[in-house]
Amino acid sequence: MAYVLTETSAGYALLKASDKKIYKSSSLIQDLDSSDKVLKEFKIAAFSKFNSAANALEEANSIIEGKVSSQLEKLLEEIKKDKKSTLIVSETKLANAINKLGLNFNVVSDAVTLDIYRAIKEYLPELLPGMSDNDLSKMSLGLAHSIGRHKLKFSADKVDVMIIQAIALLDDLDKELNTYAMRCKEWYGWHFPELAKIVTDSVAYARIILTMGIRSKASETDLSEILPEEIEERVKTAAEVSMGTEITQTDLDNINALAEQIVEFAAYREQLSNYLSARMKAIAPNLTQLVGELVGARLIAHSGSLISLAKSPASTIQILGAEKALFRALKTKHDTPKYGLLYHASLVGQATGKNKGKIARVLAAKAAVSLRYDALAEDRDDSGDIGLESRAKVENRLSQLEGRDLRTTPKVVREAKKVEMTEARAYNADADTAKAASDSESDSDDEEEEKKEKKEKKRKRDDDEDSKDSKKAKKEKKDKKEKKEKKEKKEKKEKKEKKEKKSKKEKKEKK
């Protein structure tokens, strides 16, 4: 007999096929193109209903993973009495798992079986008694949502999409703030040009405009909340002798409107920066401790997600953000870039020019470890201890390269070695006095001088003998060389004579 195992949102269904070799049919699509043909071919043999939505989700996950659950195993044991029966299964993994159970089935799962499943799924409500099309569609929708939630394992605190959008908005805000501030300084500069040189901060400049208005009111206006006392005095003095033109109230109203936008944007930027910092500490605490919130957020945004960044090797993280320079270098066969977005990290910034590349490489390696812990660790805390340890190691390496202590993370306190105290030695005054030389000592000195003279004479004699031997050896070598050369000349002469005789003989024979 041939059975078809069908997984539905309501439960497992075993359909009995009237044709034993239906999976070998060449005209399968034509044989199952209508509901009558499908109902004639398949009859329900057994049905195992799911008890709840949670049970349905559990069984669906086991099918996806290619595992045989206890509920499915019980269903298959009911029909194992039929000898030499064939079981048609949709998933290859599931077919392999059923084979391992040791049941008397010939399990089949190939491309042809997909056509059978296509026909069964189309007319499933008619095959299952007591199940309407509407009920099955509702169950399928609910199960699909459950599987989706299970796969995503959704957690609002761990969504890295928020980081990607926040860092993009932060960059846009910086550009807008710079543009607005430049426009405001140029606009108000016609009325009070000296103010831009005294006050360089854009937000403080905008707040002064909103508080003071026209420059003639500078002496009456209190700017102590915005500026230090010294700079406030300079502003008021410059306002009295300013070379700027006069402006109307309408002009001032429009300038004030722009200044309000700058102050509001600056306040929102600070709020967004705090939000991004909190999000980064929740999602990637170790990366945040190592490279900072902004650099970490830019790395995540550039790669697309925290998971894809965690899967990247250290070499990719090192040059992330410098793709154009990398491909240009490869094309022109020049040196490849040493760093990308990591250049803006504080640790790389502390290094001198020659050491920036080395520190970027070390930092990228540590960042890869921290990222994998942040993204893939099952049980992790948000303290960022691994990031702090990695940062301490990078700082130690930086200190070694720079030759000075650049560590900012707290040092490990170790116990000092115990020092044993010993008694001070007394000074020996007798060591400073020299004894008078005795007669025996003078005699021994004479004997030593005689020995030295004898040694020198012997050494000279040996040197003379060595020089004679070397001359003799050189002469023998020269004689051998001359004899060899004479012998070679003689052999060459004999060969030449033989060759000439041979050639003469050949000529005579030809004649």
UniProtKB/Swiss-Prot annotation:
Domain Nop as annotated: residue spans: 283-403
Coiled-coil stretches noted in the UniProt entry, renumbered to this chain: 435-511
Pfam families listed in its UniProt record: Nop, NOP5NT
Record keyword Iron present: no
Region (Disordered): 423-511
Alphabetized UniProt keyword annotations: Coiled coil, Isopeptide bond, Nucleus, Ribonucleoprotein, Ribosome biogenesis, rRNA processing, Ubl conjugation
UniProt-listed InterPro entries: Nop56/Nop58, NOP58/56_N, Nop_C, Nop_dom, Nop_dom_sf, NOSIC
Database matches in PANTHER family: NUCLEOLAR PROTEIN 5 NUCLEOLAR PROTEIN NOP5 NOP58, NUCLEOLAR PROTEIN 58
Additional detail: Present with 34700 molecules/cell in log phase SD medium.
Protein name: Nucleolar protein 58
Organism whose genome encodes this protein: Saccharomyces cerevisiae (strain ATCC 204508 / S288c)
Name of the gene encoding the protein in the UniProt record: NOP58
